[in-house]
From Swiss-Prot:
NCBIfam families: proB. GO terms for biological process: L-proline biosynthetic process. Its main location: cytoplasm. The keyword Nucleotide-binding applies. CDD domains: AAK_G5K_ProB (cd04242), PUA_G5K (cd21157). This is Glutamate 5-kinase. Its EC number is 2.7.2.11. One of its GO terms (molecular function) is ATP binding. The lineage of its organism: Bacteria, Pseudomonadati, Pseudomonadota, Gammaproteobacteria, Pasteurellales. Pathway: Amino-acid biosynthesis; L-proline biosynthesis; L-glutamate 5-semialdehyde from L-glutamate: step 1/2. It is an enzyme of class 2 (transferase). Residues 279-357 form the PUA domain. The gene is proB. It is found in: Cytoplasm. It comes from Mannheimia succiniciproducens (strain KCTC 0769BP / MBEL55E).
Length: 373
């Protein structure tokens, strides 16, 4: 994996309920103070940080003085609705000590599965990071229509890591990492420091569900690690109660279990773009062709001379020269109807023409794969 300087390195840190409560029935404020101290240190060093936080249901249960509720989805959603405000308020108060701003994102599966909403979430996350604001992400359990399954936030953290093109994902839990057998049952269990491939054997030793306060377990962390590493993101399962664990991980110390990347980000994106069906064709002028092939730049609306097909924002399209040669695949930031209106126009006029804008480019370089040079 290509190493980045701190000022460019993006890390997603997922905090399980057990890490935030430290074995108590409520958020452990003293421990969260220590967590925020480490994150503030890394933020000041130039790291780009994203928090994926559990703990809403535990916070809600404590705030309501541990009510006796039936074991239903509605009860879980009630606790999440009450606890989410308590959870985000705690994060906000602690980061304010260091004069660091946070921004809250509540996501559901629909936000990830719907391409338009997926792109909106990605744009919001990048906007926050670009303005040195730490995103705090959680599953929107209070309004989710599907059942709250085990490990949603583990999988969500992997998807968020993909959204922000992170270098690393830290899954902090109440375990030291992945062991060769269950350490709660076998005192001779040994920690596995590095996993280079997630095999059926690795999945089988991961075990089952987690604590009663949360919804996560080791097996879901393995699934999250699989998702992330296949997208070129190194993943580490580490003990959330270890002193200075986040800062030490960021600085390269070997802690917990590291899952090495299965492919680099570029190769992962290539595979996805190549596999996706083409929904349309953008024919570009010579200037745009040179910008893409020689200067490695994004495609601007001004360089588009013709549009074929009807497509949504984020669907894959071919980028074709006026000589009929396909030179790239890409995901446009605007749908075909919008591109018809802004093709050949200067980027500064996009908002005037459409009444809104998703940025100055038609296809960003990060959302493009060059086929031939």
């Amino acid at each position: 994996m290509e190493q980045k300087q701190n000022s460019q390195k993006t890390i997603v840190v997922k905090f399980g309920t057990s890490t935030l409560t430290q074995g108590t029935p409520k958020l452990n404020r003293a421990h969260m103070i220590e967590i925020v101290r480490q994150l503030a240190q890394l933020h000041q060093e130039g790291y780009r940080l994203v928090i994926v936080t559990s703990g809403a249901m535990a916070a809600g249960r404590h705030y309501l003085n541990h009510p006796k509720l039936p074991p239903t989805i509605a009860s879980k959603q009630l606790l999440a609705a009450v606890g989410q405000s308590q959870l985000i308020q705690t994060w906000e108060q602690l980061f304010a000590i260091y004069d660091i701003h946070i921004g809250q994102l509540l996501l559901t599966r629909a936000d990830i599965e719907d391409r338009e909403r997926f792109l909106n979430a990605r744009d919001t996350l990048h906007a926050l990071l670009d303005n040195r604001i730490i995103p705090v992400v959680n599953e929107n359990d209070a309004v989710a229509t599907a059942e709250i399954k085990v490990g949603d936030n583990d999988n969500l953290s992997a998807l968020v890591a993909i959204l922000v093109q992170a270098e690393q994902l830290y899954l902090l839990t109440d375990q030291q990492g992945l062991f060769d057998s269950d350490p709660r049952k076998n005192p001779q269990a040994k920690l596995i420091p590095v996993v280079n491939e997630i095999t059926d054997h690795i999945r089988s030793i991961a075990g089952g569900s987690g604590t009663t306060l949360g919804t996560g377990g080791m097996s879901t962390k393995i699934t999250a690690a699989d998702i992330a590493t296949r997208s070129g993101i190194e993943t580490i399962i580490a003990p959330g109660n270890r002193e200075n664990v986040i800062a030490d991980l960021a600085h390269g110390e070997a802690i917990g279990t590291k899952f090495t990347v299965q492919t680099d980000k570029l190769e992962s994106r290539k595979q996805w773009l190549f596999a996706a069906p083409s929904a349309g064709i953008l024919t570009i002028d010579q200037g745009a062709e040179n910008a893409i092939l020689e200067q490695h730049k994004s495609l601007l609306p001004a360089g588009i001379v013709n549009i074929e097909g009807r497509f949504s924002r984020g669907e894959v399209v071919k980028i074709r020269t006026q000589q009929g040669k396909d030179i790239a695949l890409g995901m446009p930031r605007y749908n075909s109807d919008a591109l018809y209106l802004i093709q050949g126009k200067k980027s500064q006029n996009i908002e005037k023409i459409l009444g809104y804008e998703y940025g100055s480019v038609a296809i960003h370089r990060d959302d493009m794969i060059v086929l031939n040079k």
